[in-house]
Amino acid sequence: MRNALGRHILCEAYGCDPKVLNDRKLVERIMVEAALNAGAEVREVAFHKFSPQGVSGVVVISESHLTIHTWPELGYAAIDVFTCGDTVDPWNALDYLVKHFGAENTVSSEVRRGVMQHAMVKIS
């Protein structure tokens, strides 16, 4: 992660299991497990179940966050995994999520956040 403060993965997950995506407790558990399996330190967890369907949530980790917004009726989930530092690989967390949500297809991209090679920092 040279010259960057963090790595932010954006994932479009298609063909996911609708029953899983609509279960707030299960989505929360999978998200927390993904963070822990990647070696992250979980700080806060907040999830909400929408009516008639859908779940949104965030797992705040010491290294940044994991977020999700689900559309069970479409079998779709929008997932973000953002990690700072070099101790947690966001792809490990994402692989866990994709597997446990049963995604048939994903489109993912990684953005390097806080690219500092041209930044000038003045501390007074």
Annotate each PLM feature.
Residues 1-124:
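Polybasic/polar functional segments that serve as interface/processing modules
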